[in-house]
């Protein structure tokens, strides 16, 4: 009878061991792929990230948004002229130099909305250069290997069925968690670029407000927001570099599950840090 029970126990152990190894095998591949590609993705200019999408955004901005910006600029220029006249006693004390100042301000505003995309790309050229230079300094291996799985497999057959079943539940939860985290990393990195495209699509409207002192804060805040989006890539690289250092501190021992849980915790920390990069960049540059 004991032989039969032992055979059943060994059979259950083999099933649980195979299931655990299946859950843990290639566990970190999705995360490795997403984290490994972060430096390349955040270092790519908006025009190169997805050229067809960028061409569509540029066409919409020039053909749909730019005429609206022209109307706003016309209103602002007329408002400035009327305000200038009324402030000088209906031209009784009007100086000719003031009209030249108005013409100069209006011409600069027209030039800015006409060359909006050149200005926007110059902003991202500066920030992407910072990201490119920092990626050469910030280094570290972020690839997570299947830690001690062969050692874990040999030790599992020595465990009882109860603890082995608990280990199976842990491995199942870890597998789901790591896949969710890989999706979260993908969403954060690609979501930043989509946010850039959305900001660029409406660029002519805030750029049209620079000619008026009362409304220029719209354009100033917009420009700060663009710099924040650009430097967010730099903060993302810093998060990945910290993640790489933390991974190197994970102790590889016979207790592979604890090591894996440590890596899961660090990956969750990475996702949380990536979420915070946007708010940190905006708070530093005073954008809202």
PLM feature spans:
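Hydrophobic alpha-helical transmembrane segments
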Residues: 66-79, 196
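Transmembrane alpha-helical segments of multi-pass small-molecule transport proteins
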Residues: 74-81, 171-173, 200-204
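Membrane-water interface regions at transmembrane-helix termini and the short interhelical loops
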Residues: 81-94, 182-186, 214-215
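Gly/Ser-rich, low-complexity
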Residues: 1-72, 87-97, 107-177, 216-221, ...
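Extended serine/threonine-enriched, polar tracts that run as long, contiguous segments within proteins
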Residues: 182-189, 193-196, 200-239
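Membrane-embedded alpha-helices of multi-pass transport/permease systems
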Residues: 75, 120, 124-127, 184-187, ...
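Sec-exported extracytoplasmic/periplasmic mature domains
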Residues: 83-86, 105-108, 199
